[in-house]
């Protein structure tokens, strides 16, 4: 089941978009106020520093609670059983605590989610050891249902990333059992990543997938990185040498021309996708992939001295950046050099904070007035 209140999440997103459109002049101040009134109920979302503090505090409470529970039960009961029961009890309380306090990735819930997953691991590894099968992918397969359940219920992005990597490890482990599997490993990893990307991208276009929006974004980005790494010549060649215990320098690999093609073709595909779908993630990954491709080529083939390569590369990048900036002074094809409104909003917030600090410095004689705070009392708010 979905633990978080999806209505609150949609209200939070609606307020964010309303503020953005107001900054862009698409909404008047009255319309912004009306939108914020309609979507007034939002989850608790403190600033980053408070999130970190709450995360550390919740983790400490979770570990102290588990230690206290184990001391109460005594040493006569299996640690894995006690840990698993503690995980179930914590999950039961968490499912009721989140709607009551209207949390969403506030630090407390993240810490307890990770704690619940960690508390189930001793029992899973005890089951794995009882099977007496010396295959790590079986342990990963036993963990996978827990991760899938947590991702479905909470949509936690870091757990979703762990789920993706867990499946990747299972696929790689199965293929590495024989020479043919090792030879097909790069293609299998690319297919795995491509399949994940296609499925999650189609899922992200469905209105019902809003609940998992952040997790899907993390999965998409990770799948794109793995897809490129699986086809990169440097990664394939060096991994082949490591897996087969070959001496340095690593020998040439089979289908070298194909992987050289992947090394340079995949970044161009990402760039094309970024332009085609106005996708910043694809565009940035395409640029980073181009840099990685050039470095890969430079690693195996010395064309110019390093100094000349850096000078010419920097000059070319500067000229390209200058030309693109000039062309995009006026928006073209959906692209613009204009700064992001979010950046302007952050700058405005920083200006307000600095002015408030300055005013406080010059008005110390008024005394300290407590009260009015939204978090922890004493006038301390949870956000600027």
Predicted regions and their residues:
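Alpha-helical multi-pass membrane segments and their bilayer interfacial helix-loop junctions
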Residues: 1-384
């Amino acid at each position: 089941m979905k633990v978080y209140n999806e209505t609150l999440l949609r209200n939070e997103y609606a307020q964010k978009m309303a503020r953005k459109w107001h900054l862009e002049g698409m909404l008047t101040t009255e319309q912004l106020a009306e939108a914020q009134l309609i979507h007034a109920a939002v989850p608790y979302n403190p600033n980053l520093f408070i999130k970190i503090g709450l995360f550390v505090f919740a983790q400490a409470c979770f570990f102290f609670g588990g230690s206290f529970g184990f001391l109460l039960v005594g040493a006569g009961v299996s640690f894995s059983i006690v840990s698993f029961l503690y995980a179930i009890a914590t999950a039961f309380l968490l499912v009721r605590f989140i709607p009551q306090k209207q949390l969403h990735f506030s630090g407390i819930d993240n810490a307890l989610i990770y704690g619940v997953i960690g508390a189930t691991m001793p029992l899973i590894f005890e089951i794995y050891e009882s099977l007496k099968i010396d295959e790590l992918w079986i342990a990963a397969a036993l963990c996978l249902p827990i991760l899938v359940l947590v991702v479905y219920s909470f949509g936690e992005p870091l757990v979703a990333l762990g789920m993706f990597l867990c499946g990747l490890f299972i696929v790689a482990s199965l293929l590495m059992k024989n020479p043919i599997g090792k030879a097909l490993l790069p293609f299998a990893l690319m297919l795995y990543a491509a399949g994940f990307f296609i499925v999650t991208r189609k899922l992200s276009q469905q209105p019902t997938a809003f609940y998992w929006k952040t997790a899907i974004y993390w999965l998409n980005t990770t799948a794109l990185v793995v897809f490129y790494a699986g086809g990169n010549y440097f990664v394939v060649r060096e991994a082949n040498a490591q897996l087969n215990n070959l001496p340095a320098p690593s020998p040439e690999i089979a289908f070298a021309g194909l992987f050289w093609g992947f090394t340079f073709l995949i970044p161009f595909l990402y760039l094309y996708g970024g332009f085609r779908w106005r996708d910043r993630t694809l565009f940035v990954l395409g640029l980073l992939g181009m840099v990685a491709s050039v470095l890969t080529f430079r690693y195996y083939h010395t064309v110019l001295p390093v100094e000349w390569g850096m000078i010419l590369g920097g000059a070319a990048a500067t000229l390209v950046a200058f030309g693109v900036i000039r062309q995009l002074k006026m928006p073209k094809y959906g692209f613009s050099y204009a700064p992001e409104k979010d950046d302007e909003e952050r700058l405005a917030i920083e200006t307000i904070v600095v002015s408030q600090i300055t005013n406080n410095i010059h008005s110390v004689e008024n005394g300290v007035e407590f009260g009015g705070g939204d978090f922890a009392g004493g006038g301390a708010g949870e956000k600027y």
